[in-house]
Amino acid sequence: MSPKRRRHRTRDTEHVARHEEEVGLGVGSAAQRYAAYKAEAQAASSLRARWVSTLSFTPDPFQIQALDAVEAGSSVLVAAPTGAGKTIVGQFGAYVALEQGMRAFYTTPIKALSNQKYLELCDLYGSDNVGLATGDTSVNSGAPVVVMTTEVLRNMIYAGAPLDDLGVVILDEVHYLADKMRGPVWEEVIIHLPAHVAIIALSATVSNAEEFGAWIREVRSSCEIIVSEKRPVPLYQHMIVGEDIFDLYAPTGKGKLNPELVAATRDSEMRGGRGSR
């Protein structure tokens, strides 16, 4: 075949392919449409879809990614600013465990936060399904979902407590692992939990999230790392000088101190004021 005839044949083939694509008859188009339909049907019937339908808001992309990872049974590390919505990932983990007939442990670093999460989960799943176990309080500790301090879970592991029916552990405020005094507790829990237990680690934004997630993946065999730096709730910083409150930074100029604050501080120092804080 001459080069000229080959070029004509190529142009004709491309024209037919474009026409078939436009009318939906291209190679693989039927398979692609079926695959898309099947994926949509599966998504609509998923636990995630049912959970999301109960929410009063539309989850952000990072939340959807985390929910899908949880439903797939993978461990997941979610690092996002305070107020970004990490909590619903932990709540969904408890929901999945309940739907699958497994137990879920929701751990926090302090008793006050455990009490708060206990009340939140009671509102979601009913007090019959939620328990509380801290150092000095035990409420319905045999419930399918139990809120506890991380130390309580560590002690359960070392005491050989039966965990065969435990499906997931939510580690709230997992960035405490970097704490010199209490960090080893989180480390021991992550390392010594039974292999079948998935971990949902919720953390404030940290600089080494990828490294942290890689370590969890190393000791737990799987971990999806999801990082969001979007702060939906604005963070404002102020300073009080005497009886007045000032914005810490100028409205324009990133990182530049508020000139009114600087002037007020100097004036206070000149007058020997000691009221700045």
Question: Language-model segments: which ranges?
Answer:
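A short beta-strand-to-loop transition that corresponds to the Sensor-1 phosphate-sensing loop
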Residues: 82, 110, 148-152, 173, ...
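SF2 helicase catalytic motif II
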Residues: 146, 150-151, 159-201
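Conserved SF1/SF2 helicase motif Ia
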Residues: 79-82, 89-116, 194-196
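Conserved catalytic network of the ASCE P-loop NTPase/AAA+ motor domain
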Residues: 70, 96-100, 123-125, 137-141, ...
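Helicase-associated low-complexity/disordered flanking segments
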Residues: 1-68, 72-75, 234, 254-257, ...
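Conserved interdomain linker/interface between the two RecA-like ATPase lobes of SF2 helicase motors
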Residues: 191, 198-200, 205-277
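Residues immediately C-terminal
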Residues: 139, 173-177, 208
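Conserved nucleic-acid-binding Ia/Ib motif block in the N-terminal RecA-like helicase ATPase lobe
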Residues: 102-155, 214-217, 224
